[in-house]
Amino acid sequence: MSLMLEPNPTQIKEERIYAEMGLTDEEFAMVEKILGRLPNYTETGLFSVMWSEHCSYKNSKPVLRKFPTTGERVLQGPGEGAGIVDIGDNQAVVFKMESHNHPSAIEPYQGAATGVGGIIRDVFSMGARPVALLNSLRFGELQSPRVKYLFEEVVAGIAGYGNCIGIPTVGGEVQFDPCYEGNPLVNAMCVGLINHEDIKKGQAHGAGNTVMYVGASTGRDGIHGATFASEELSESSEAKRPAVQVGDPFMEKLLIEACLELIQSDALVGIQDMGAAGLTSSSAEMASKAGMGIEMYLDDVPQRETGMTPYEMMLSESQERMLIVVKKGREQEIVDLFEKYGLAAVTMGKVTEDKMLRLFHKGEMVAEVPADALAEEAPIYHKPSQEAAYFAEFQQMKMETPKVENYKETLFALLQQPTIASKEWVYDQYDYQVRTSTVVTPGSDAAVVRVRGTEKGLAMTTDCNSRYIYLDPEVGGKIAVAEAARNIVCSGGEPLAITDCLNFGNPEKPEIFWQIEKSVDGMSEACRTLQTPVIGGNVSMYNERSGEAVYPTPTVGMVGLVHDLKHVTTQEFKQAGDLVYVIGETKAEFGGSELQKMLHGKIFGQSPSIDLDVELKRQKQILAAIQAGLVQSAHDVAEGGLAVAISESAIGANGLGATVKLDGEATAALFAESQSRFVITVKRENKEAFEKAVEAIQVGEVTNTNEVTIHNEENEVLLTANVDEMRKAWKGAIPCLLK
């Protein structure tokens, strides 16, 4: 739309054009009051995008305040591009997770690829070198052709971007449930390393300093992407393909190197990624955080399309762009630095003292808005909350143990459930060894990456069982954090902190808002007990298709510190003769389990219970035993229960099996999904020391028979399974479904 054709302020009000941009009548009245006049078209666009849920968190802020965000090691909590945690020796780890759900639903390859690109920029804008990527993905059932297409394209998009840019994709999770059929979830996480003195903030300090635009040129892609992410998907969403950005990983690779060199220069004052809401959010947020204003001359914006209006330039979400503030008089150094990498760096404005964001185009002022009004003063809504109707019904159900006729057949069927089955088809497309720092590759409880120049490593994982959270949001929220910590501990790491990606339906529905509140309550309590503060994250609402919401999916991304790489532990059995231990008590808990879903085609009842104090005690004991060199392998018991966990530890080894005896009712002993449980193997000579250090029950030993045999307490054989056959079933399940 050319400037001549844009509606005037009176038309915007009378024809309610602001509503098409996502502003309510009340919000538009607030804008009018803030400005003391009617806004023009560009100004209306600025407010609509900055006040969207995606940028302002206006529906979720009251809930997010419940998270613990400080801790001894926390150097930067929520509010910047990414959070930062101290790991000793003047080094810190920088990490964040974000969603790209709506774009991936309609343009899966580019949606996923640009999700990866955006999260990488958040990390290097802090001054950190990105060292690893992870992802957490949710899709419908693979029997559907549309789901197959989305799954294949999302994985290809993540691989295409990550592999080209040269950052290893080392871990993640993929789950399949019918509720994600029309609305897949694509959450990407990036982890970086930094020295303390290199930490940079997205702040525009120093009146008179120069505002520069660096990186790729601006096109019309992604306009109103943030607003698009703040509404439900519908049939008309397909028409919004232009709102999906297009990524160029090679450009981003150059941008990383140029920015990391720039960060070493004392000419740099502040730096921020142009992410959601592009130039608008980066300029308004940098000015607001510093208590300053910014003037920008939009004729100087590098444009790759002709005739772009101020509105289009400010709202474009073209990829691979950064906004920087540099000391006045040092601009040429910056231009030269970026030129060396073949990238543009242009002066397009200056920092001012009056806290206003002013935009000029073709010699005229086209917008004048208080920076704080855009970045900080979006309305905050305390949405009504109402317990979901199904919850009381599920809580009152008398839970029966599912009827299982044949334990071996059931185990094989569980190993072939896509959520449990091997994800090798996925991660074999990712380069997880590039940079040669990956110590534990995908497929174990957590990935581990070496901290170069030290004996240390970083363990990292993404976790969330959304079925449990649907059944009981508060308990499920606790379990999500606890399971992430369990995976870190099983890998030899001390849990440090989390980033989260809160994926929910429409928050304007009281039952959905109740899910949000309760799951955040549960997560917050777990974070406090396990001492893993929340250092940043992302909220993705309106994940619905035709009014049906996805399961509440607050994904947890956790990073832990492996103090010495010789403590690194993996899940597979190591040698015949080692003793097998189970830690934790098994109860007949099947609500939300893989067995329940497989046998009944749906989930119902109560989620498994969790005692966070018991969880913490077990994790501390196990980590101490690992650090004392007493543990051969460690694996948390998750989907599918003990039978699956023991089988996975055998499948990962070569030529090894196990003979195990489990007490209690057979179906529960094998397949229940009780929490805070671990399968651990120990060398025979360490038996006494291990049993002194950890409250554990020896249930059997590792054999060289290549079979897993499980007995009941009467010593009757419940099942015997050949490990090669299990491996074939487990590895073949997803490729078979995709054929």
Swiss-Prot record:
Binding residue positions for ATP: Y57, K96, D500, G537
Alphabetically sorted, this entry's keywords are:
ATP-binding, Cytoplasm, Ligase, Magnesium, Metal-binding, Nucleotide-binding, Purine biosynthesis
Q: Which residues bind Mg(2+) 2?
A: D122, D273
Q: Where is the signal peptide?
A: none
Q: Which residues bind substrate?
A: S99, H100, N101, H102, R121, Q245, E317, S318, Q319, S540
Assembly and oligomerization: Monomer. Part of the FGAM synthase complex composed of 1 PurL, 1 PurQ and 2 PurS subunits.
Protein name listed in UniProt: Phosphoribosylformylglycinamidine synthase subunit PurL
